[in-house]
């Protein structure tokens, strides 16, 4: 199937959450994902069948091959460098596998939308956040070292990334 045919058959997702989930397997909870919820009606992988897990991985791989460039995957990998130990999602391994076979680019907001949803509550201190920002070149304001202030920063950043991702996907006709 040629690339144009694949594009013409792109599904229309009912919400930004499902669209991001299908594209990146973005977890909604520690062991769950938007796509697993959409596929199984559950809140995590625990209630999914083996076939559903395989189907989810296939969707993520397809989306990454279609929409991410090697440069985008390097950005994702840099972000994951700080969270590999806590990762329970196969996206880390998929990104390594797919890195050299991705034909085209995707806006950075897509990457941010995924990463912020996945790791907002895993970043425990401002020092980690500052290092993350320096390594990726993504500016994140630092309000202070108290946890409440850090949470406010992360929540504001997460909301902005999701708004950007939703607008882009709406413009492309991927969500209603």
Where would I find each of the regions flagged by the language model?
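N-terminal interaction/assembly modules
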Residues: 1-74, 78-105, 125-142, 147-176
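Short, leucine-enriched amphipathic alpha-helices that occur as contiguous helical runs
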Residues: 72-73, 108-117
């Amino acid at each position: 199937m040629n690339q144009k045919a694949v594009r013409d058959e792109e599904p229309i997702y009912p919400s930004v959450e499902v669209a991001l989930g299908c594209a990146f397997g973005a977890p909604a909870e520690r062991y769950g994902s938007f796509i697993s919820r959409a596929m199984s009606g559950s809140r995590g992988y625990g209630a999914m069948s083996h076939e559903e897990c395989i189907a989810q991985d296939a969707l993520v791989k397809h989306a990454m091959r279609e929409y991410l460039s090697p440069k985008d995957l390097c950005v994702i990998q840099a972000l994951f460098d700080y969270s590999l130990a806590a990762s329970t999602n196969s996206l880390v391994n998929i990104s390594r596998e797919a890195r050299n076979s991705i034909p085209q680019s995707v806006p950075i907001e897509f990457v941010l939308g995924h990463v912020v949803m996945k790791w907002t509550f895993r970043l425990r201190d401002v020092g980690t956040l500052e290092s993350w920002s320096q390594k990726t070149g993504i500016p994140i304001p630092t309000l202070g070292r108290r946890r409440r202030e850090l949470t406010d920063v992360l929540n504001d950043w997460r909301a902005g990334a999701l708004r950007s991702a939703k607008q882009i996907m709406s413009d492309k006709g991927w969500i209603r």
